[in-house]
Structures are given as C-alpha cells and as structure tokens.
C-alpha cells in the first residue's frame, strides 16, 4: 500500500494535512491553512517539490 495525504478541518475551522506512510503512520504534518483550497495547494506543492528534494543534515551543528 502506498502513502497518502489526508486533509482535515480542525475545530478552529482551519485546515491541515498529514502525509501517511503505507502502514498508516503519520510521517509529515502541514502548517494550518485558512482555506481548503490553500491546503490542497500545499499538498500539490509537496508532491511537486519533494521528489527532487535534497537532505540538509544539520544535526551535528
């Protein structure tokens, strides 16, 4: 099973999404968005930018 994005509307009325791994575990959570459309745009942005993203490991600093 592949991963998926789950879009939710919180009690505050704002939207956010989680990226779930194939096993259902949350591996990323977005910021909160004022509109559903903005949250969907955020999902598309992750889909577009993540495949070529490099890792900037700053854990030793």
Residue positions per predicted region:
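A structural feature that tracks compact, well-ordered secondary-structure segments
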Residues: 3-10, 14-34, 38-46
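Short arginine-rich
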Residues: 45-56
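Short, charged, surface-exposed hinge/linker loops at domain edges
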Residues: 59-61
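Generic structural motif recognizing short loop/turn segments at the entrances and edges of beta-strands
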Residues: 1-4, 51-53
């Amino acid at each position: 099973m592949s991963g998926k994005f789950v879009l939710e509307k919180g009690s505050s009325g704002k939207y956010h999404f989680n990226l779930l791994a194939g096993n259902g575990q949350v591996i990323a959570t977005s910021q909160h968005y004022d509109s559903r459309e903005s949250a969907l745009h955020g999902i598309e942005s992750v889909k577009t930018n993540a495949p070529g993203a490099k890792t900037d490991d700053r854990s030793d600093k």
